[in-house]
Amino acid sequence: SPMIRDRIDQPWREVGWDEAIAFAATRLRDIQARHGVRSIGGITSSRCTNEETYLVQKLIRQVFGNNNTDTCARVCHSPTGYRLRTTFGTSAGTQDFDSVEHSDVVIVIGANPTDAHPVFGSRLKQRLRQGAKLIVIDPRRIDLVRSPHIEAAHHLALRPGTNVAVVSAMAHVIVTEGLHDEGFIRTRCDWDEFQHYAAFIADPRHSPEATEALTGVPAATLRAAARLFATGGNGAIYYGLGV
């Protein structure tokens, strides 16, 4: 049963649905009366269906009379969508789920596939049991780091908020040690832009040794992970909303 209370210092009490809905509607209208029509908004989570999200925005627009509505699908994905579009020309990922079956070395960063995406997590585990190597970049010791029959080759247990420093340090190793595929870059990328990036990332301040104190990732571990990803065959990166 729904529960309501008139003040925060009062105990909750169970009521029927009609009373609960009327209570919420009255309180929301009171807020608008005191603070203006735009004082109410709504945001839906990734757990909501398209239909539920549609109904929430319809409630906000038609009942409350404003456009203060948003969804986690935009809030959470807009940074990655923008960067993917400027880097690859499309705001969608470049790989589908089937790609994991052709991967030789995989980076999982800011994601916990076995908990959040169990179907994909199962396929990834299957590929790892077949011999693919795994690099986990996550402050937490997620299931993929070590579980029955699989173990990550490297777990970069970085401090929260240092994703950019860790990725930059990996790029530093790959570029300064000449592990990048120059032919591929010349054919498929903007070579002049890459030259600018290579000069930037080769700066010693991006080295694993320089960033170790910030990220908490030992320089030797980070260098080994970067070398594995650059030389391990078909590489794949799967990221989640943790980045």
What are these model-predicted stretches?
Residues 1-179, 192, 197, 218-222:
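N-terminal export/assembly segments and adjacent metallocofactor-ligating motifs
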Residues 170, 188-243:
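Active-site phosphate/pyrophosphate-binding segments
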Residues 180-189:
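Short, flexible loop/turn segments with low-complexity composition
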